[in-house]
């Protein structure tokens, strides 16, 4: 994360760190070049795709909480790193419109290629914990609403018996030493009729198999919570040549006794 700019020295350090980050993204991972190659399905293109997507990526990395903070002129001008936006400032509606039209598969491929570079450059040659590359896997809720929904939304009844629509995914990322890298994400899928929506374990197995197929031996150990103490999931890890560490709560200590016996 870039240093806070409370002093002139802090401002200078922040600018240097941002410049170094952008240079590294361009020279090593070729991310700006790949962004320029994304498909642009807009009929009208008053602002180039790159001039929207690249700033969005940078602001996500800088952990800005709201696009309104960035893409609202003129009051946010001082909050916007000048290195990231050149030319006409896109309005937040233009940002939303473009992002909604980008093919997620193209973004996923850029991410996968970034992981390939990390492996090729042996970023994790010393491991992340005790000499091993350890990765955690868990479910993450991404979006929730009782009013808005899409065909890919999962659904359930909340405490007031209203239907809640949400997106949920399973994420696998390194734990331990920096850098903390997300290897991949698998969206859980809705099911028709009376069947329950796809569960976290199903998505996790699919994610592990996909990562193994795409990246080979991407980690040594997978760490998970008690939900993943499941024979089909553990067998999937074994098939992919992965060890596992699963954390159980104290009230489930009988499972330890069963395992020891």
Spans of features found by a protein language model:
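Charged, often Cys/His-bearing segments associated with DNA-binding zinc-finger transcription factors
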Residues: 1-26, 32
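Basic, short loop/linker segments at the boundary and entry of helix-turn-helix/winged-helix-like folds
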Residues: 22-54
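Short, positively charged, Gly/Tyr-enriched micro-motifs
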Residues: 45-115, 230, 237
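Short, contiguous clusters of charged residues that form electrostatic/catalytic patches at enzyme active sites
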Residues: 53, 167-170, 202-209
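Short, conserved catalytic/metal-binding motifs centered on acidic residues
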Residues: 55, 70, 91, 95, ...
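Active-site-proximal, Lys/Arg-enriched surface segment
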Residues: 96-178
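A general structural motif
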Residues: 129-132, 167, 180, 214-219, ...
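An internal, acidic/charged active-site-proximal segment
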Residues: 187-261
């Amino acid at each position: 994360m870039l240093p806070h700019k409370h002093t002139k020295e802090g401002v200078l350090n922040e600018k240097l760190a941002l410049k170094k980050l952008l240079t590294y993204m361009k020279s090593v991972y070729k991310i700006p070049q790949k962004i320029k190659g994304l498909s642009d399905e807009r009929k009208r293109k008053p602002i180039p795709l790159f001039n929207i997507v690249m700033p969005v990526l940078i602001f996500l990395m800088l952990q800005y909480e709201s696009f309104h903070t960035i893409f609202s002129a003129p009051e946010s001008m001082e909050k916007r790193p000048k290195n990231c936006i050149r030319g006409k400032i896109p309005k937040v509606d233009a940002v939303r419109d473009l992002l909604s039209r980008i093919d997620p598969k193209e973004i996923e491929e850029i991410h996968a290629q970034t992981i390939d570079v990390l492996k090729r450059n042996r970023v994790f040659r010393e491991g992340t914990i005790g000499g091993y590359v350890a990765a955690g896997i868990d479910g993450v809720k991404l979006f929730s609403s009782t009013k808005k929904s899409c065909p890919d939304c999962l659904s359930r009844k909340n405490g007031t018996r209203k239907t809640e629509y949400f997106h949920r995914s399973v994420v696998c990322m390194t734990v331990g030493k920096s850098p903390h890298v997300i290897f991949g994400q698998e969206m859980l899928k809705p099911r028709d009729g009376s069947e329950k929506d796809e569960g976290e374990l199903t998505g996790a197995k699919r994610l592990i198999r996909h990562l193994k197929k795409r990246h080979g031996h991407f980690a040594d150990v997978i760490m998970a919570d008690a939900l993943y103490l499941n024979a089909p999931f553990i067998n999937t890890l074994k098939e992919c040549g992965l060890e596992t560490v699963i954390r159980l709560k104290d009230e489930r200590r009988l499972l330890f006794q069963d395992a020891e016996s």
